């Protein structure tokens, strides 16, 4: 087995472009024992030319996989069972019933909220009927988490792309993508940590394979997150960038405009709709697991800053002595304001603040320039959207961490961004939250058409009640 693994490794290295192997050699001293010799052997006899599937920028030596070109889309059948069969799947009665409900709702101009039980294959249930309609141009699908987003791209999207040539794109925030400029700068140095240098080698190989630049494709990166924080994208692209034409975040933005189906997550959907009110204009928007969008709206209306980490960071900057006199004074003012807030919180834990009460802190933040890490932590507080501030402290065995938290006066009005969409379909495992409240109310939506599909009662569920405990309604506060 070890010998087979070695042969596989040798074949893999030999299949890489020569330019990539040469860059691997610059870091090969960080490998264990004599593994470097395998790389040196692989470069012998390597062709100097570069295959058409790759592209390289001579100044950096980094080799990338050339962006894919998409084939003409195949037309889907109007019959759900036929499309399912073409995917080599079997149609399920409840899945088909759900798909038929989706088709019926397309003629309704109101927002449609469809309640359907879990486990019936809802993703194909809404994708197939929507993609089969000639008047449905583009579709945006929002799911609760990046994990589910990746799952759809690896399963349903991959199958639909293979059979029908449907152009899917997974859209995430810029921090999910590698920034090639930042990565290139790390290649110009040999880190003292061998693990970091091995990650550089891994990324050089990965860049010859990835079509997205999505760092979620890298496994076990949590082992050294500090390095990945250094090379993740910040959403900015310098005019003189060596990689302007191949920047993954810019490519992702462009692909999102061209794709037939864009898959994103609830949190990033809210971010994009707030930044770009036309993001869903003329498109069919499907919010999957709509009941969880309520939590995303609540999280989106808040922001927090770790004041303990902030103070540590300010202290390190001041100790370095590299700042100008003005910057030093501003940092000292910021340090004083933050320390004062923490001390005040220890005396009055329930105290809340408005923007006027934090005016000096916010003013110092606005004047502070050149400290990008600090600004990244603090800049969201400058927006007038946040009106209420308070502090919270988490206690651990040997230390405590204090956070400055900010919230908006009201939750984001989701309905303000939806009228531009061609059609909005919210799929939810439940519509009713209580006797007088439902998911639509919590999302702040009016003119919602609610459709509840029959749901099977699951016989394997049980609720256990401890009868020795007092009833909540009659128990005293003591």
Residue ranges of each PLM-predicted region?
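Walker A/P-loop NTP-binding motif
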Residues: 104, 123-136, 155-159
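A contiguous, basic/glycine-rich beta-loop/short-helix subdomain that forms a polymer-engagement track
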Residues: 236-257, 275-276, 364-477
């Amino acid at each position: 087995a070890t010998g087979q693994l070695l042969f596989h490794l040798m074949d893999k290295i030999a299949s890489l472009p020569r330019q990539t192997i040469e860059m691997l050699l610059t870091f090969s001293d960080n490998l264990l024992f004599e593994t470097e010799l395998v790389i040196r052997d692989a470069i012998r006899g390597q062709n100097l030319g570069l295959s058409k599937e790759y592209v390289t920028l001579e100044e950096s030596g980094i080799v990338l996989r050339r962006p894919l070109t998409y084939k003409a889309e195949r037309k889907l059948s109007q019959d759900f069972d036929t499309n399912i069969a073409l995917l080599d799947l079997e149609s399920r009665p409840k899945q088909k019933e759900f798909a038929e409900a989706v088709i019926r709702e397309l003629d309704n101009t109101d927002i449609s909220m469809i309640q359907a039980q879990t486990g019936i294959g809802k993703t194909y249930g809404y994708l197939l009927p929507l993609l089969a309609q000639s008047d449905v141009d583009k579709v945006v699908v929002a799911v609760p988490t990046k994990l589910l987003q990746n799952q759809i791209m690896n399963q349903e999207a991959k199958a639909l792309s293979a059979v029908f040539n449907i152009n899917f794109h997974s859209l995430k925030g810029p921090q999910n993508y590698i920034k090639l400029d930042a990565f290139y700068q790390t290649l110009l140095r040999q880190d003292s940590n061998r693990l970091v240098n091995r990650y550089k080698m891994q990324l050089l190989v990965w860049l010859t394979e990835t079509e997205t630049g999505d760092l979620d494709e890298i496994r076990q990166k949590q082992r050294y997150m500090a390095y990945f924080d250094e090379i993740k994208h910040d959403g900015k692209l310098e005019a003189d960038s060596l990689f302007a034409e191949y920047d993954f975040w810019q490519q992702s933005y462009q692909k999102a405009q061209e794709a037939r189906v864009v898959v994103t997550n609830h949190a990033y959907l809210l971010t994009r709709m707030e930044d770009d009110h036309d993001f869903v204009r003329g498109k069919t928007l499907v919010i999957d697991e709509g009941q969880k969008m309520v939590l995303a709206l609540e999280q989106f209306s808040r922001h927090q800053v770790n004041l303990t980490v902030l103070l540590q960071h300010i202290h390190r900057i001041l100790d370095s002595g590299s700042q100008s006199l003005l910057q030093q004074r501003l940092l000292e003012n910021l340090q004083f304001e933050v320390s004062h807030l923490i001390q005040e919180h220890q005396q009055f834990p329930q105290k809340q603040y408005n923007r006027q009460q934090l005016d000096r802190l916010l003013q110092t933040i606005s004047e502070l320039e050149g400290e990008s890490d600090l600004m990244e932590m603090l800049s969201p507080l400058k927006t007038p959207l946040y009106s209420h501030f308070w502090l919270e402290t988490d206690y651990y065995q040997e230390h405590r961490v204090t956070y400055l938290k900010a919230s908006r006066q009201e939750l984001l009005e989701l309905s303000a961004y939806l009228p531009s969409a061609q059609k909005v379909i919210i799929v939810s495992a439940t519509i009713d939250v209580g006797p007088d409240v439902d998911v639509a109310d919590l999302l702040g939506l009016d003119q919602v058409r609610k459709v509840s599909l029959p749901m099977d009662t699951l016989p394997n569920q049980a609720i256990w009640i401890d009868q020795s405990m007092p009833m909540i309604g009659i128990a005293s506060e003591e």
